[in-house]
Regions:
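A short, Lys/Arg-rich alpha-helix, primarily the initiator
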Residues: 1-22
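Short, basic-rich loop-to-helix N-cap that marks the start of a DNA-contacting helix
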Residues: 40-53
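Helix-turn-helix DNA-binding elements, focusing on the entry/boundary residues of the two helices
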Residues: 20, 31, 45-48
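Short C-terminal boundary/hinge segments that cap the last helix of small helical domains
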Residues: 56-72
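Alpha-helical residues within the helix-turn-helix
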Residues: 14, 25, 53
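Recognition helix of helix-turn-helix/homeodomain-like DNA-binding domains
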Residues: 28-43
């Protein structure tokens, strides 16, 4: 079973030592709003690209960690 975009974001946040609040601040949105988007897996492609940039990942249709090359 593959992970949702929201689940992938949570995995990468953990590996980056970041919190949801950190990501919300860096993407200029409230933590509750971002939390809702993650739980509902409701993102636009533009939002996913911005999140990937903040997390130092490449966004294709998957997340790929730039430093390890691991696809999540």
């Amino acid at each position: 079973m593959s992970l949702t975009a929201g689940e992938k974001i949570k995995v990468i946040l953990g590996r980056r030592g970041m919190t949801l609040a950190d990501l919300a601040e860096k993407t200029e949105q409230s933590r509750p709003n971002l939390s809702n988007k993650i739980s509902r897996d409701n993102f636009s492609e533009k939002e996913l690209k911005e999140i990937a940039t903040v997390l130092d990942c490449t966004f294709e249709t998957i997340f790929k960690m730039n430093d390890t090359g691991e696809e999540i």
